Each structure stands twice: as C-alpha cells, then as structure tokens.
Amino acid sequence: MHGALFENMIVMEVLKHRYNQGFSGGVYFYRDSNQNEVDILLKEEGEITAIEVKSSMTYHASFEKTLRQLTNWIKTPVVKRAVVYGGDFENTQSEINLLNYNNLHKLLHA
C-alpha cells in the first residue's frame, strides 16, 4: 500500500506542476502485455521524459530496468529518464537520473 500511495503522490505533483505551467495534458504511463511498466511519461514537443517511481529508501539497479528498455517499446524519442525514490543518494550525471522525491522539481524544470 505504501508504494501505491507514494507513486500517487508523485503523479499528483507532476500533474500540479504541468497544470501550473499551462499544460493541459501530456502525462501518461506505459504498460504492455508482458507487464512491462513505466510509471510516468511526460510528452512535450514530440519527446518523452520517462520517470520510474519507487518508495524504497535504498537504491537498487533493478529500478532502471524498464527505463533502459523503453526505447525498444515506443517510437517517440526518450530524451530524459529518471528514478524518483525515497532515498537520499542522488545522481544526475548518468544516463538515468536518480532523485529524491523532494527534488522532483529539478527534473520538471530541466
């Protein structure tokens, strides 16, 4: 239950940010018949920002699995990828950003 509530909180923050910026849509999720899933896809100007949400306080490399595979499943270019989670360690220098949920705004304003 904790994970679902955490994910819902992050989705709501993304939606609030987009609406406050004057965007009326462009927030999606991805799930296919093989149960591959990405929690948030932000589509803007023909490009995608993909976000995986994890309530865990500890980072695991498996958090990035679907973000790495996403380009095999969709045609729209994925320009940014991030894991937003409950832990303190952050990394914004790699192909997939790792952010504490309190710093979600850094991803949304980038």
Please describe what each predicted stretch is.
Residues 1-110:
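A cross-kingdom feature that marks ATP-driven nucleic-acid transaction machinery
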